[in-house]
Structure formats: C-alpha cells, structure tokens
Amino acid sequence: LSMLGDIRYAPVASVVMGFHRQDVEHPLDGFGALHPEVEQLHSLGTIFSSSLFPGRAPLGQVLLTSYVGGLRAPHLVTKTQDEICKHVLEDLKTVLGVTGKPTFRHVCVYQRAIPQYDVGYGRFKTFMKELEGRSDGLFFAGHCRDGVSLGDSIVSGHDAAGRIAHYLKATS
C-alpha cells in the first residue's frame, strides 16, 4: 500500500465568504467563474454557492466559495488564513465588484486535494486493481482511482458500492 503514498497531489484551500448582497456588484447569475492564469489572480475560481443552492445564505446575503493553490500556486495554501482571505477578497473585488467586508468566512486547507494524473499514473490504477483482485473485501474508490471531478467521484463510489454488494452476496 505504501506505493499509493507516491501519488502526487496538489494542495488547495477552500475559502467560503458571505457578503451583504448590496456589496457585490455582479448579478451572480450563474455557476461561478474560473480564473485563468493569464488574469494573474490568486484564486483558481469562485462558485456562487448561494445562487446554486438556495438557503445557503441568510436573506439579503450571498455566499461565495473560492479555491486557492493547486499546482498554479501551491505556496498560497501555506499562508495564514488571514493572508489567504486577504488574497481572495482582492480577487473578489476585481472579478465580482465586491465592495464590503465579509460577514462570514471559513477556510479549509487540503494538502492532498487533487491527485495529479502525471505520466505513469496508470501504474497506480493497475496496482489498485491488482490489489483488489487478490485482497478479499478491499475496494478502492474516489478521485485517485476514477477521475478528479465530483461527478467522477460519485460514479466511482456508486460502482464501488455495486462491487461491494456483489462481493457480500457472493460471500454470504
């Protein structure tokens, strides 16, 4: 199993901030925004959480979730939460026209957030499949096995649940 520790991951900080609606110029009428490297922003992108999921913010407020780090700027996740929030707030002012201070903020840092499917990554997938094949009751699922997106992880979990159910039926 120690081989799986060699999978390279990008670190990411998730920064959730709430604002009074009148302090955000952008209509927030979509999913969010990805911030391409050419824009020279600190954050990778921002999701308009309260637009996507009603009830995520009190009436008259909005909730925004930004992501910092990745392979583009892994050093940013080593900063203090105050420094990370300062960088994100600068970006939100630029991209969304935020004028006020956050009414709420929460930062989570994930040192091993996104597995990198580098050249040769297939050896990890092969190892997982072989290990599952020779280890009764061992099943792998998730972003390190079947894709990094949330959708990929859901499908991976569903498929693993099916394999587990089949295994349990066959062994009982």
Which residue ranges define each predicted feature?
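Surface-exposed helix-capping loop/turn segments at secondary-structure junctions
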Residues: 94-104, 166-172
